[in-house]
Amino acid sequence: MPRVSAEILDISHTGGNESPTLGELLKDFNDSGRKKYPGENAPTQHILDLAPAAETRSVPFLLSFNNLSYNVVLRRRFDFSRRKTASVKTLLDDITGEARDGEILAVLGGSGAGKSTLIDALAGRVAEDSLKGTVTLNGEKVLQSRLLKVISAYVMQDDLLFPMLTVKETLMFASEFRLPRSLPKSKKMERVETLIDQLGLRNAADTVIGDEGHRGVSGGERRRVSIGIDIIHDPILLFLDEPTSGLDSTNAFMVVQVLKRIAQSGSVVIMSIHQPSARIIGLLDRLIILSHGKSVFNGSPVSLPSFFSSFGRPIPEKENITEFALDVIRELEGSSEGTRDLVEFNEKWQQNQTARATTQSRVSLKEAIAASVSRGKLVSGSSGANPISMETVSSYANPPLAETFILAKRYIKNWIRTPELIGMRIGTVMVTGLLLATVYWRLDNTPRGAQERMGFFAFGMSTMFYCCADNIPVFIQERYIFLRETTHNAYRTSSYVISHALVSLPQLLALSIAFAATTFWTVGLSGGLESFFYYCLIIYAAFWSGSSIVTFISGLIPNVMMSYMVTIAYLSYCLLLGGFYINRDRIPLYWIWFHYISLLKYPYEAVLINEFDDPSRCFVKGVQVFDGTLLAEVSHVMKVKLLDTLSGSLGTKITESTCLRTGPDLLMQQGITQLSKWDCLWITLAWGLFFRILFYLSLLFGSKNKRT
């Protein structure tokens, strides 16, 4: 056993933010017995070898859990009665067991038995104050420590991946997120290549993941890629929630074969599984069968026949032992007594079993981890630096700037491989622009032309926001990837939000130029290049704020239909109270507050000011004052006579060429007098920044990945 500093593994909750990762920490040991790889020089990378482990293993890890209980309070929704009744549901009831390195512990049971809940409890995904009982690794409590995130991995049931990245690229990005920055890129690539072979993905290495519209890898390969992402750092503890779900028997068996090799490399593998085949049962080392949160069997699959035989329900020959067991449990659950007798029998049977004989020495956690790293676990880089205490272990492998760059690079690479989506977005905006251009073709400087300009601006600015709603399903899909990756601190939430905002800017700029170029001159807007430049800027700002509000809503409400409903409703209210349908002066006092938080108000007022702020432009001359009134249909001669009559009454000579209303007069009539066009631009940009901050907070506090 290598000598380990006593300071190495203090698993307290303290620590600095910019300190090395665990892989950089655990490097003060004798590494001479480790397998060397071609061209390997210090600093070195420890590469996981998934070949079958030797029979004698000198570094055991023992994950023990005792008397785990977890209850949730069920409150009735929309209960307006005075009686505030709440029922308590038990999800886990006094569960005890253990899992060892080199073995696969499988948790079985029917739907609602508590399989996923037990996996979550062992993986630290249940709030500490809600879970009763203890979980220890080699006798030390690590459930809520930062150490658990460093030495463990959790593979979710969903296989959501970026569809246009290849298998190799997906794993390479995972290595950039999870492996130490000090590790050379060549070593990270070597780790990825090794993992591809170990997962049996060599033939699919350069194949894109794929989705509904793009052919990609098979379901089994996709599941193995998901596992590979989470084991890129070669964790000691590996938790999987139904890794064989949705796979055929062959692919399911191949996945469990991979998990068996991972276990034999020195990992503790714990997974839930619904109904394993006979071949899969042969790969499992220990079973825990649950029924309504209670343990009805805990032991080796080999002992399952004798267990049920002793219970009085012998398993017939050539019968799948777990299928039979689950059928018996399902039958008992439907009886009046339930599984009470089986639970009590299991408790007595456990007490009568002799303790497992083992030649493995019980060692402390710090010694076990240090020796495990020396054998190649926890992929890391070594340098000649002095040993660093566990108190300085960093939660993240990269600084924020590096995380932002990696996230942006991955997003852009996936995005540029979907030219049809890029073209569709730009095409939609251009078609909308061309439609508006033909409807509002070359508007003149008449009262009708002024009114039609306002209609064009109202519809055009609202289009900017509604076009952003297509981002809702895209982000909701990405949200699950974000949750999985941030569960074990692949990157900071702030880095994700910043990169998400930055990569959207070029897209929004292209959309802004496309819309501005197709409408500015065709509609007949004034002001020349300077006015066109500002027109592009305010459209860009409108797209930015629209994209931000949509991103925030989709981060807050992870349901596509509900997000659409909230977004459309909010934008409709913004349009109603933004100043086009009703002037600010006529909005009721109890709704005036919404006028000022309307996202549409500021870009709408900005383009109006940009168009009408020139006092030399006249929009109502002489007889045009009668347009839109009952006198509009009278003869021109009569209108001139009416002007003469008005001149006498007002004491001012009004002729056919007299300007009666300029652009600023129209702005005043619309109640647009409080802000300049540049104020409107900055406020629109600030709204976008505000909603990005809310998006960050919604992810930070709403994506804890823990049961309460």
Swiss-Prot record:
* Name of protein: ABC transporter G family member 18
Query: A GO CC term?
Result: membrane
Taxonomic lineage of the native organism = Eukaryota, Viridiplantae, Streptophyta, Embryophyta, Tracheophyta
Q: Which SUPFAM superfamilies match?
A: P-loop containing nucleoside triphosphate hydrolases
Q: Name one Pfam family in it.
A: ABC2_membrane
Q: Origin organism of this chain?
A: Arabidopsis thaliana (Mouse-ear cress)
Q: Which PANTHER family match?
A: ABC TRANSPORTER G FAMILY MEMBER 17-RELATED, ABC TRANSPORTER G FAMILY MEMBER 28
Domain (ABC transmembrane type-2): give its ranges. Answer: 402-612
Q: Which domain of life is it from?
A: Eukaryota
Residues in domain ABC transporter? 75-317
Q: Give an example GO molecular function.
A: ATP hydrolysis activity
Assigned keywords, A-Z = ATP-binding, Membrane, Nucleotide-binding, Transmembrane, Transmembrane helix, Transport
